[in-house]
């Protein structure tokens, strides 16, 4: 029989899954609708589409692992699931890095010649360099994940050598994350500096258009800060999620760590929706119509 704590964790996991499913689904539909409306892809729409798609896959992988991990413990399918999981996780981080670079290019205002040159000429080159590094890191992750050797199972009380997979999983998860994290932090730092210099200018000049630019700075920083916090929680919870599945598994620990991991692809989608005015207004209208319909048809 399930305990009250385990039942609560299951409820939270279901709520997170539904929030992420709806949020990422809205972002995917919005990106495709913008493409149909304009018959062209913008950089921002492509980044949002890729980010939402990766989060959508990551959510289903978490649910799949949470539901079927007892069946995968003694199966080679766990190795392939683990590799695919790492690839999707790294792709999500890279799309978030592209988003931070996009914000930095569109919002920051510096008058220094070096920055103007970087903004005008080196932006596209930097994206191609990041894409090349991303492909290399994916290939290395696949090679490490698919060539790892499993020791014989024998009569061990642990059906699957999780102590070995723990270190392998952490290595796989972090091997391709160092460069995008550095770029992400540099871009976020430039946004903070730009907001600070803009705030100083506002003290001298009148408000007006500069208020909109300050609001854009704050919205971008909220989205990037939320992503960084949730991603760090996801990274910390990942190895503990693996070790909690040793045989016999501790279901309470499994749900605690998996719920923390599921917050990453679910909650950040809400921050992205709040940062897109048209999507935010559409969601508010839908919620308002739903509430009104419930009041009209309710008892």
From Swiss-Prot:
Membrane-spanning intervals of the chain: 2-22, 46-66, 83-103, 128-148, 176-196, 224-244, 254-274
Membrane topology: Multi-pass membrane protein
Classification via Pfam families: TAS2R (PF05296)
Extracellular-facing ranges: 1, 67-82, 149-175, 245-253
Highest taxon of source: Eukaryota
Keyword terms: G-protein coupled receptor, Glycoprotein, Membrane, Receptor, Sensory transduction, Taste, Transducer, Transmembrane, Transmembrane helix
Molecular function GO labels: bitter taste receptor activity; G protein-coupled receptor activity
SUPFAM superfamilies documented for this protein: Family A G protein-coupled receptor-like
Residue intervals on the Cytoplasmic side: 23-45, 104-127, 197-223, 275-299
Keyword Transferase: no
The keyword Glycoprotein belongs to this UniProt entry's keyword annotation: yes
Residues that carry a glycan: 155
Major localisation: membrane
Any single GO CC term annotated in Swiss-Prot or TrEMBL for this entry: plasma membrane
InterPro entries xrefs: TAS2R
Residues spanning the signal sequence: none
UniProt similarity note: Belongs to the G-protein coupled receptor T2R family.
Cited function: Receptor that may play a role in the perception of bitterness and is gustducin-linked. May play a role in sensing the chemical composition of the gastrointestinal content. The activity of this receptor may stimulate alpha gustducin, mediate PLC-beta-2 activation and lead to the gating of TRPM5.
Misc remark: Most taste cells may be activated by a limited number of bitter compounds; individual taste cells can discriminate among bitter stimuli.
Name this protein carries in UniProt: Taste receptor type 2 member 5
